[in-house]
């Protein structure tokens, strides 16, 4: 097992941990590959691998057959390169003033969303003497990041000229679904049609794309007709279902967040707990203190609403969640919880523990937000995994 501290290199024992199962990552990539059919799989490892650790997830995904990697920013791509990941990686979100030279020097593919970005990329190619591998990010209806229909022809013409000059290699055309988590929504087909038309327009103007990709996790699992040349799953790589109402798709959640109990103490009926005394013991009972709080990603909005699992049994949080700690009620009578026992905040759910999806439903959010939230003093650890391509 390897350990990666999120904030500090010198760590005391018994800190909260996010344990990442790399075998689950490999399993999930295998599931996605099966659904993708002949299409390749790009494993998206942006946002530090959705909170799971980009480098470790990248290696596990590649070993399981992912063809390449996707990230949001050039900085994320360069971090993978610094860690020795040599596989193809595409970055697609660039603030104004981004210098693409480091990306080109590190053999990072760049997706551009405007003629301005493409001009900046050409400038970097000229300064470095490197040929840029470029993908066009197209807006087909999400109205977010991507070149729109009106500006697309000018960008295609600029691509053709730059490719003719040897400044760029045209690699791909990509877009992103607005209703991917609603597979039957008619707008999914509208976006696919628009993307196809954009590829045809480019061909008519002398530009051809090696790969076209549109599908995110839910589409990769439910809409094989939208696979094009490659699918681009994110959350499914980490085992979280992208469409909870349709089940888990055979995915295995890779993250378990747990924290050792730091104190066990009895209280009497009438004693109140934590800030504001929002919970009062109705009987004599025993409490356990768990040293993780909202600074570590335990949402304060979960106060008095969620449970943890200790030694295979669930216990409710009582009182407000604090910055560094929260309290659970072990109930009256003898208890089988001691200091040092792990309180599982969420995990795969296979042993009855709460899941990230449970938290998402309590918070009226999505499991994406839950798994990207552990931070602060939470230490990332890894189990499973094996060597493979980087």
Swiss-Prot record:
Superkingdom:
Bacteria
Q: Which NCBIfam families match?
A: alr
What are the UniProt keywords, alphabetically?
Isomerase, Pyridoxal phosphate
Describe which pathway this protein belongs to, using the record's wording. Amino-acid biosynthesis; D-alanine biosynthesis; D-alanine from L-alanine: step 1/1
Q: Where does this protein come from, organism-wise?
A: Mycolicibacterium vanbaalenii (strain DSM 7251 / JCM 13017 / BCRC 16820 / KCTC 9966 / NRRL B-24157 / PYR-1) (Mycobacterium vanbaalenii)
Where do the catalytic residues lie? 46, 275
Q: Name the PANTHER family for this protein.
A: ALANINE RACEMASE (PTHR30511), ALANINE RACEMASE, CATABOLIC-RELATED (PTHR30511:SF0)
Residues annotated as signal peptide: none
UniProt gene name = alr
- EC numbers for this chain: 5.1.1.1
Name the UniProt record assigns to this protein: Alanine racemase
- Please give the positions of the paired cysteines in each disulfide bond: none
For the modification N6-(pyridoxal phosphate)lysine, the affected residues are 46
- Where is substrate bound in this sequence? 144, 323
Which reaction is the catalytic activity of this chain?
A: L-alanine = D-alanine
Q: Which GO terms describe its molecular function?
A: alanine racemase activity; pyridoxal phosphate binding
């Amino acid at each position: 097992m390897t350990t990666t501290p999120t904030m500090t290199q010198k760590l005391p024992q018994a800190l909260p941990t996010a344990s990442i199962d790399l075998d689950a990552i490999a399993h999930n990539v295998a599931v996605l590959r099966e659904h993708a059919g002949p299409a390749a799989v790009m494993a998206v490892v942006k946002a530090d691998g959705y909170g799971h650790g980009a480098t470790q997830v990248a290696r596990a995904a590649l070993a399981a057959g992912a063809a390449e990697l996707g990230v949001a920013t050039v900085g994320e791509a360069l971090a993978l390169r610094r860690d020795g990941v040599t596989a193809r990686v595409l970055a697609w979100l660039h603030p104004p003033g981004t210098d693409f030279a480091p990306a080109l020097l590190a053999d990072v593919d760049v997706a551009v969303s405007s003629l301005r970005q493409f001009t900046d990329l050409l400038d970097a190619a000229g300064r470095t003497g490197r040929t840029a591998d470029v993908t066009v990010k197209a807006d087909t209806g999400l109205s977010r990041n991507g070149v729109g229909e009106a500006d697309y022809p000018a960008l295609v013409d600029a691509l053709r000229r730059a490719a003719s000059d040897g400044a760029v290699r045209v690699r791909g055309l990509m877009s992103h679904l607005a209703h991917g988590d609603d597979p039957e929504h008619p707008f999914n087909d509208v976006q696919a049609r628009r993307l196809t038309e954009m590829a045809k327009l480019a061909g008519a103007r002398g530009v051809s794309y090696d790969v076209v990709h549109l599908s995110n996790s839910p589409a990769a699992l439910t809409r094989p007709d939208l696979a094009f040349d490659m699918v681009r799953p994110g959350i499914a790589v980490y085992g979280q279902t992208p469409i909870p109402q349709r089940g888990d798709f055979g995915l295995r959640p890779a993250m378990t967040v747990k924290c050792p109990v730091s104190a066990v103490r009895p209280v009497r009926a009438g004693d109140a707990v934590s800030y504001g005394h929002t919970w009062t013991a109705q009987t004599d009972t025993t409490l356990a203190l768990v040293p993780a709080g909202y600074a570590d990603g335990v949402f304060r909005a979960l106060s008095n609403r969620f449970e943890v699992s200790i030694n295979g049994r669930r216990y409710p949080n009582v009182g407000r969640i604090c910055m560094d700690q929260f309290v659970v009620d072990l109930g009256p009578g003898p208890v089988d919880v001691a200091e040092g026992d792990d309180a599982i905040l969420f995990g795969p759910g296979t042993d009855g523990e709460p899941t990230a999806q449970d938290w998402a439903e309590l918070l009226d959010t999505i499991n994406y937000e839950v798994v990207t939230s552990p931070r602060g003093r939470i230490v990332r650890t890894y189990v499973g995994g094996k060597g493979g391509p980087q």
